[in-house]
Amino acid sequence: MGRTADSSFDVVIVGAGVVGTALACALRNTDLHIATLDAREPPRFAAGAELDMRVFALSPASQRILDALGAWETIRATCVAPYSEMRVWDATGNGRIHFDCADVGEPALGYIVENRLIQHALWLRLKTADNITAIHPATPEAVKIGADQVTLSLQDGRHLHTRLLVAGDGADSATRKLVGIDTLSAAYGQQAIVAHVRTEKPHRDTAWQRFLPTGPIALLPLQDGRVSVVWSLDDAPAEEIRTLDDSAFCAAVTQASEGVLGNVTATTPRAAFSLQRLHASEYVRSRVALTGDAAHAVHPLAGQGVNMGLLDMAALADVILAAQARQRDIGDLSVLRRYQRARKADNLAMIMALDGLKRLFSNEIAPLRLLRNVGLRAVDRFTPLKSAFMRRAMGLSGELPPLAR
């Protein structure tokens, strides 16, 4: 990987998070000249350091993608927590559901991995690629789309030219805004409070989620025996919970999780992330593609955000490589629409499903409370339907891009 003064590229990827870096990896060692841009330097990773506050529940499909990119071996050898079961229940009734990876013949339902470690493993792959140029830090200031290329102007005065501009710079994507692609979005007025805690009882490689009227709380197993708490609350109570002292926070998590792992005995400092629903009106324009959170954002109650983004990346990489192999213009709108057809409807279905679940479980109208409890019990007992839900959440159903198979 180089840091050159070149200003002309085949693909410029704005945003060097998990999805953007993964796309660069998918295009490494090809005859395409790739640039990655980010406002920050890549995050530093040190084995044995305190775990990153941001951990992801990677689906088996995401694991396969990272394996195909050559990053999984580093992740597996460093720090990963597979979970084989998941238990979900409603705080205001007797509805509950139990998912087990054995029911669908998979070794795990998913894998809890630090955001920082995933990026580190991907960057190790990029370091050996001679067709990748890293331009960090760099901030886009203007975009001009021409017939044959995009000109991307940076705040430091540089100008980059590319056949294809990919926006992977998050839900507040500056690139998407500069291009002028609209979104349908709504703030939930909630925050996800995140911390790593120690509990009296072992997590048994199980993820736990309890739906409270105020928002879901999830306990995700970590490799070192702790669990990662992801607790979604309205803004005001979230701030109260976040600022509790350690003892009071541990007691609050114990109560909210119904003591499923016994008392919470220790905690890290807390972090908070604002929650919203967002979907771009279009994923592509001539010479432009959106991917990951730049195209969509979802409620974290099912941990699907990064998994959706990695599937986006895999589909876009497939479209780019297929076009290049056929000597077609990788920035042509007819080429890029293949990517939009592959991902937009699928992502919309997931966004609406998660939004519906969020609203259903936060509504205390008696008929809806009865409906969700009856529904949970029914799905738990009807194995074919439960298996279908599991395979969908695990990224194992539908038409998958080659990297995810």
Predicted regions and their residues:
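N-terminal Rossmann-like FAD-binding beta1-loop-alpha1 element of flavoenzymes
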Residues: 9-36
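Conserved N-terminal helical subregion
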Residues: 7-8, 78-178, 186-191
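Glycine-rich FAD pyrophosphate-binding loop
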Residues: 28-51
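Conserved FAD-binding catalytic core of PHBH/FMO-like flavoproteins
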Residues: 66, 149-270, 275
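C-terminal helical "tail/cap" subdomain of flavin- and related membrane-associated enzymes
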Residues: 318-405
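N-terminal FAD cofactor-binding segment of flavoenzymes
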Residues: 50-91
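FAD/FMN-dependent oxidoreductases across multiple families
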Residues: 239-331
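Conserved Rossmann-like nucleotide-cofactor binding loop
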Residues: 19, 42, 172
